[in-house]
């Protein structure tokens, strides 16, 4: 089986690389995997992307690529839509035509954040900024491509939020600032769930493949994929700083000295949803139907467990 993983240079793509490299020796029939980054294919070149798909002929496409510069997207809408909408559309068209499986990633930014409680997969999209609009367009393009039917093709769109991993992210930024300053002010009235790329990659592979590396069948559609619990940006920052101090990091600020502020006091070019909490009941039902309790344990893992492990590894590697 051929597998194409797009976005190899991003946080999620790197997590897939590490996970799959560890998994391959355990498989009897190991798949042929190619990781694709900017040096392998310019995703804005539709001809080049189609040529790559047709030449490699993947049975599984994992699209971990994305334009994620939320504020910059406000002035680069063409590029944001090219990568976040047109690229998944081309991948979906290939999957429909050749009976492949497409695993694509989307975001909480497709919602306006005005709902009370947890968003469901079929709640109305109402993105506030260009980034969210481009990701919503990608979701719709995939669904439209598959709406005509495909004998073997299937797709899953994993909506996730507040992603962090090997690369630039909120947690690493906060820890860097905590080394430089005794004064930190962090937004306290935007809520969501921090999601580790390591966690997300593992859940993704468990969803699409069995223990032998054979592709699973599943109902095509959107699935929310985040760990258990919820927090706000101030809560995440405080927990990250507290954890770093526990592991011996030299910081200039204590976790309880971080000042909470409302979002209106920290204006940004692109608006953010105030509520990014998403229900994962639909994803849970898939794993419950497979009677795989170990996978359910991973789904039920609280967000702070992975954050603690992440910060510990940063401290151990001297990156704080």
Language-model segments: residues:
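NAD(P)-dependent short-chain dehydrogenase/reductase
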Residues: 143-206
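Adenosine-cofactor binding site in Rossmann-like domains, unifying the SAM/SAH pocket
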Residues: 24, 29-51
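NAD(P)-cofactor binding segment of oxidoreductase domains
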Residues: 54, 75-103
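Catalytic helix-loop patch of NAD(P)-dependent Rossmann-fold dehydrogenases
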Residues: 82, 86-90, 110-158, 162-163
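N-terminal Rossmann NAD(P)H-binding glycine-rich loop of SDR-like oxidoreductase domains
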Residues: 1-22
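Amphipathic terminal alpha-helices
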Residues: 295-320
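NAD(P)H-binding glycine-rich loop region in Rossmannoid oxidoreductase-like domains
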Residues: 43-83
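Mid/C-terminal beta-alpha module of Rossmann-like enzyme folds, strongest
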Residues: 203, 210-268, 314-320
């Amino acid at each position: 089986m051929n597998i194409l993983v797009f976005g190899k240079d991003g946080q999620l793509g790197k997590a897939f690389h590490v996970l799959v490299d560890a998994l391959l020796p355990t498989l009897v029939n190991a798949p042929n995997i190619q990781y694709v980054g900017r040096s392998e294919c310019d995703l804005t070149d539709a001809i080049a992307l189609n040529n790559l798909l047709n030449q490699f002929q993947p049975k599984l496409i994992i699209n971990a690529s994305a334009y994620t510069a939320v504020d910059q997207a406000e002035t680069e809408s063409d590029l944001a839509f090219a990568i976040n909408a047109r690229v998944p559309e081309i991948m979906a068209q290939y999957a429909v035509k050749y009976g492949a499986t497409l695993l694509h990633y989307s975001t909480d930014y497709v919602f306006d954040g005005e709902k009370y409680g947890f968003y469901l997969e079929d709640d109305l999209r109402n993105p506030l900024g260009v980034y969210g609009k481009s990701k919503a367009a990608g979701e719709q393009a995939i669904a439209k491509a598959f709406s005509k039917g495909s004998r073997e093709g299937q797709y899953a769109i994993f909506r996730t939020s507040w992603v962090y991993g090997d690369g630039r992210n909120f947690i690493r930024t906060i820890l860097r600032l905590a080394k430089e300053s005794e004064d930190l002010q962090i937004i306290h009235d935007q809520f969501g769930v921090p999601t580790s790329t390591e966690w997300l990659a593992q859940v993704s592979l468990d969803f699409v493949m069995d223990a032998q590396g054979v592709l699973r069948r599943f109902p095509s559609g959107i699935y929310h994929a985040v760990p258990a619990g919820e927090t706000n940006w101030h809560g995440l920052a405080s927990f990250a700083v507290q954890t770093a101090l526990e592991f011996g990091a030299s910081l200039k600020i204590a976790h309880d000295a971080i000042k909470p502020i409302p979002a209106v006091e920290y204006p940004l070019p692109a608006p953010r949803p105030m509520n990014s909490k998403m229900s994962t009941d639909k994803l849970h039902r898939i794993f419950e139907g497979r009677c795989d309790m170990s996978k359910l344990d991973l789904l039920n893992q609280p967000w702070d467990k992975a954050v603690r492990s992440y910060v510990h590894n940063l401290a151990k590697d001297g990156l704080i």
